[in-house]
Amino acid sequence: MDGGLRYDLTVPLSRYYANHANELPSPFKALQMGNVWRADRPQRGRFRQFMQCDIDILGEPSNLAEIELILATTALLGKLDFKNFTIRINDRRFLKAMAAYSGFKEEDYDSVFITLDKMDKIGLDGVAAELKGNGYAEESVEKYLALFEEITNDVEGVRLCKEKLQGYLAPEAADSLEMIITSVESQKEAEFKMSFDPTLVRGMSYYTGTIFEISMDEFGGSVGGGGRYDKMIGKFTGQDTPAVGFSIGFERIVMLLLERGYEVPTSKPKKAFLIEKKLPQEKLLEVLEEARKEREAGRQVMIVNMKKNKKFQKEQLAEQGYTDITEVYNG
């Protein structure tokens, strides 16, 4: 029998959820730490065995999952005294739309994205040379790279993509990404920048939508990342389940923390906001603001969409320790 070492925590979590979904709350919020392995060449901050610290939300189809994960991860980094880092964010649907718009065939997307992922190392000219060297039409390559020169790294860049990629990019994908960026920017606790990066690819082929990475100048690269993987659990159950995760490299963070001192904050009673589905962004921002204040006060806070069987949902929350529950309605 062939054997292998665990590559990440996402696949095992998906398998666990697939086997126990009926016993778990929905959405299911998981926090885990564990060792994983890579066939990498060891160097500063890069190891063949290292520990990942993951937070995931399974069963939540809306972008509330992305907003919560990014806010939670960046709040943690802020409490560890990290400042002026960048959350680079993109969406796999943007990558595919830009490739289609430029004339690349769908079967060539993976190859094109592998080259695009080298943008930080070889630059625009290097990417152009490699794509042409791989036999892609010069017209497609030039049209493709012209997009990256035109698109800005903010919400205006997202809006430009929505306008320019009509017929290739679903408008709701652009609207969702813009909402994530603006919501996080308005509610963030730490000092960091949200940057729309249309060149961000991330290597995991299982991502289906939003993808993001944490970049720190003092490290010279990424210290964490994640994204949406709505098709993963369906491989085990036959039914797709929405899921988003964010992972931080423990050793990389500790390596940077060794230069400073830090004390773990004490925890206080848990609080849950039970919100009506399809809550307007303005109302959602109010909830996120209140949750931020509660977290600043040292409380563990959960925001979850209201279900039809509210009584059972509250019982589940109580079992998880959320005894202080606030219901939020549109009106």
Give a label for each model feature.
Residues 2, 86-87, 245:
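A residue-level structural signature of the nucleotidyltransferase/glycosyltransferase Rossmann-like core
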Residues 74-78, 94-101:
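Hydrophobic mid-domain F-helix/FG-region of cytochrome P450s
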Residues 22-31, 81-87, 106, 110:
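Short secondary-structure capping/junction motifs at helix and strand boundaries
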Residues 8-21, 30-82, 131-331:
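Positively charged, Gly/Ser-enriched RNA/tRNA-binding surfaces
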Residues 84-94, 112, 195-201:
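Short, surface-exposed recognition loops or helix-turn segments adjacent to catalytic cores
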Residues 1, 104-127:
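Acidic, His- and aromatic-enriched active-site or binding-groove loops in soluble protein domains
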Residues 47-53, 89-97:
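Short, conserved phosphate-binding/catalytic loop or strand-edge motifs used
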